[in-house]
Amino acid sequence: GYSSAASDVYKRQTSVCIPPAYVKQVKEYVQDKMAVCTVIGFPNGYMTTAAKEFETRDALTNGADEIDMVINISDVKNGDYDKVEQEIIALKAECGNRILKVIVETCYLTEEEKIAMCQAVTNAGADYIKTSTGFGTGGATLGDVKLFREHIGEAVRIKAAGGVSTREDFEAFLDAGCDRIGSSSGVALLTKKA
């Protein structure tokens, strides 16, 4: 059995994010004790919207509770913000009441593009804007989180991922306005003494 400390950590973690191929197996294991999340369009978001819709439906059928989608960075770089927004709308429609997080991969975007993505995510009705996949050239920064907080709608939450590895980082990102932190060091962050 779990010790009380381990049990407390388990309760404080919101979800576990895993590859789509393992959603069904992990959902059967965790059942309703923890939300199961998977990433659609990983890692660069270059597939078509139809492919992302299929991938989303498949993940939800297999038991995913939350979907993280990767935007098509090329569409952003080409200034086709409406196309990005329409894709988010399509995937949110597939998700229904389930949580949709939109990964914008901030390390590749200019400030103008980040602000445009805040607007697209807000307009499309997504639940979260997320900084990064963890596979880009950089992860979350406090500056990006503060920029998001200034430019997203009130209903949109912020998730920082990548680069949050110490208790000090964790607290700084929460103070900057994050609603969730994605970290491969989650258990260690929650169990270390302050």
Which residues does each predicted region cover?
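Catalytic cores of alpha/beta
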Residues: 47-56, 109-120, 164-179
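Generic structural signal for hydrophobic
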Residues: 8, 59, 91, 120-121, ...
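Single conserved hydrophobic/aromatic residue that forms the stacking wall/gate
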Residues: 1-6, 10
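Hydrophobic faces of well-ordered beta-strands that scaffold small-molecule active sites
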Residues: 16-18, 36-40, 67-69, 100-104, ...
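Conserved, mostly hydrophobic/aromatic
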Residues: 26, 59, 102, 129, ...
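Glycine-rich phosphate-binding active-site loops on the catalytic face of alpha/beta enzymes
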Residues: 42, 62-75, 126-138, 163-166, ...
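Structural motif
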Residues: 11, 62, 94-95, 124, ...
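Active-site-adjacent beta->alpha loops and helix N-cap segments on the catalytic face
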Residues: 18-33, 47-51, 74-94, 109-114, ...
